[in-house]
Amino acid sequence: RILAPLEPAAGGSLETLLALRTRLPPGQDIVSYSANVFRDWCWGEAECRLAAEAVAAALGAARPQRILVLGAGAGRLAYDLHQRTDAVLTAAVDYNPLLCYVGRAVADGGTIPLVEFPLAPRSPASAAVERTLSAPVPTRPGLEFVMADVMRAPFQPGTFDLVVTPWLLDVVGQPAADVLARINILLGADGRWVHHGSVAFDGPDPAERLTLQELEETAAARGFTDLQASEDWMPYLAS
């Protein structure tokens, strides 16, 4: 058993909580990250390889058996890590149903025809491009896609020995200290956390616009030790 039991939120009736619920940011809809679908499963092979290699380099000789990718998007990094390691479980968590369903279908060996609307088309002819999504090979058993809020990941504490957060910390819209505390809860003894991507915090609260050094200090305050950081240039959504 790795899934935590679902319990009603404390502090009020369901009707009250629904009335007071926080709305999603206006830019967060089902197609907000559709470019990631095409990057992951069509034209972004080199970019995806660099991301997987960066995470693998951070792991060194470690051989995680239970991997959690929070904010997995369309799932290519989770797929690549699962294929590269001998993990018995890799859980790819994202709350976007389009990304989860496409990732599941393609990772299982399916092909999906889908029209891409590029973020910055170079000509009228490239404003809508027919693509075919597919994985290099079907995934081996153990890769699971879970549609859930990363701040409420439905797993028992201590389930994983590796948590990966790709391009997540500075876009999740929550204080970094809270995100890191939740990550730490999900890690078992001697577990590892690897963040891949930017740390360009630019939220409305100036106190949360952390530098890399401040992020490391925040992580240490939330129980992480032996922190190491490296920086490099990598392409991002470079179609």
Residue ranges and their predicted role:
Residues D161-Q174:
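A short SAM/SAH-binding and catalytic strip from SAM-dependent methyltransferases
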Residues A148-V163:
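A short acidic, Gly/Pro-enriched loop at the edge of an enzyme's catalytic core
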Residues R1-L59:
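Conserved Class I S-adenosyl-L-methionine-dependent methyltransferase catalytic core
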Residues A74-A87:
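Conserved SAM-binding loop of SAM-dependent methyltransferases across substrates and taxa
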Residues A177-A189:
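A short glycine-rich, Lys/Arg-flanked "PGG" loop and its adjoining helix->strand segment in the class I
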Residues A107-R152:
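S-adenosyl-L-methionine
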Residues D190-V199:
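Conserved beta-strand signature within the Rossmann-like core of class I S-adenosyl-L-methionine
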Residues R63-G73, A91:
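Conserved class I S-adenosyl-L-methionine
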